[in-house]
């Protein structure tokens, strides 16, 4: 028996997928599980689905978990924080152009982050607090997820290519033990457009986890 995690509560799509797999649908709090005996290529289903799909190992032993690491933007929270900051100060279009360049492969993450940061140069850092208070919302299930790991003595960490201010606020709010994100330079309460240390890209995330 295989279990497919359907990361959505979109009932009709879950049932359609279950029918295709000859499986049974199980409703959980924030997702569906599809139990099937049929062999299938998950990559094919991922390509044709707007919903995240993952295989759940029925033999997985939770006792072996020692660390849970999560991204922040559009993961633990529902928004992209740097985009929300840009909207707040009227720079949404400029930031969107850089995002589009990155999506087209013209910029890697480090280059795109530095360009976005340079656009935000000069803004008052009080905008961060405003965005966190008024725009940042936890994704459904975030609190339950962190509570589960902490109650089972499993360490938690948020590692993000976003801004350290938001990652640390989230860390404090949820009681997450470890945190790593981009630390930006602020002088006289204004962003200088410079980053302190390395940009937290995929390699830096992997390095931090290895520590």
Segments (PLM) and residue ranges:
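Hydrophobic "anchor" residues
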Residues: 75-76, 107, 191
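Short connector loops/turns at beta-strand edges and beta->alpha or beta->beta junctions
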Residues: 73, 91, 122, 184-185
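C-terminal cap/substrate-recognition subdomain and adjoining C-terminal extension
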Residues: 127-211
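Ser/Thr-centric signal marking residues that sit
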Residues: 75, 99, 156
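Asp-based phosphoryl-transfer active-site loop
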Residues: 65-81
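A metal-dependent, Asp-based hydrolase signature
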Residues: 81-151
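Non-catalytic pre-domain segments flanking phosphatase-related domains
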Residues: 1-70
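Residue-level signature of catalytic and energy-coupling elements of molecular machines
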Residues: 74, 105, 160
């Amino acid at each position: 028996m295989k279990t497919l995690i359907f990361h959505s509560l979109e009932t009709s799509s879950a049932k359609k997928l279950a029918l295709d797999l000859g499986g049974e649908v199980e409703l959980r709090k924030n997702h569906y599980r599809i139990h099937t005996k049929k062999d299938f290529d998950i990559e094919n289903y991922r390509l044709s689905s707007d919903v995240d799909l993952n295989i759940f190992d029925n033999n997985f032993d939770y006792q072996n978990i020692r660390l849970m690491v999560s991204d922040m933007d559009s993961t633990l929270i529902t928004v992209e924080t740097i985009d929300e900051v840009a909207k707040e100060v009227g720079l949404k279009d400029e930031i969107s152009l850089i995002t589009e360049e990155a999506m087209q492969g013209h910029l890697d993450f480090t280059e795109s982050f530095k360009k976005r940061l340079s656009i935000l140069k000069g803004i008052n850092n009080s905008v961060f607090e405003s965005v966190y208070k008024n725009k940042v919302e936890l994704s459904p299930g975030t609190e339950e997820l962190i509570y589960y790991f902490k109650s089972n003595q499993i360490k938690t960490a948020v590692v993000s290519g976003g801004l350290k201010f938001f990652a640390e606020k989230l860390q404090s709010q949820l009681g997450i033990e470890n945190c790593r994100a981009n630390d930006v330079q602020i002088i006289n309460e204004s962003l200088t457009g410079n980053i302190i240390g390395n940009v937290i890209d995929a390699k830096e995330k992997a390095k931090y986890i290895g520590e």
